[in-house]
């Protein structure tokens, strides 16, 4: 009986291990990126429905809508690139949001502005965003 022994050089084993590790890394990254996109799409759909129900529903009172403006602004800032808007609409929304934030940040005697009049500043922007998500 003769035993044939295959001798692999350490360099060839190292190359094989490196290739295997890189392949595994690419598979893991592909899975993570793919599932991340799916989660983000599901999240976008859920948030857009929530925004449309809140701000597109005439039975929701003005003060409830005003209280939820930060959620609308966060939605727009996160997903503005996904909304089908004309450049003019996008510019109008951005200007209204800037004006809203400037007014909200103004303080009188150390207290920020109160009342529902801030809601009126971005009323047009709200209607454009609601149309875009419906």
From Swiss-Prot:
Q: Which GO terms describe its biological process?
A: cellular response to heat; cellular response to UV; innate immune response; response to bacterium; response to heat
Annotated signal peptide: 1-38
Which InterPro entries does the record match to this protein? Turandot
GO cellular component terms, alphabetically, are: extracellular space
The record's principal subcellular location, in a coarse class, is secreted
Domain of life assignment: Eukaryota
Q: Which UniProt keywords apply?
A: Immunity, Innate immunity, Secreted, Signal
UniProt-annotated location(s): Secreted
The record's function comment reads: A humoral factor that may play a role in stress tolerance.
Q: Which family does it belong to?
A: Belongs to the Turandot family.
Its protein name is Protein Turandot E
Q: Which organism is it from?
A: Drosophila sechellia
Q: Which gene encodes it?
A: TotE
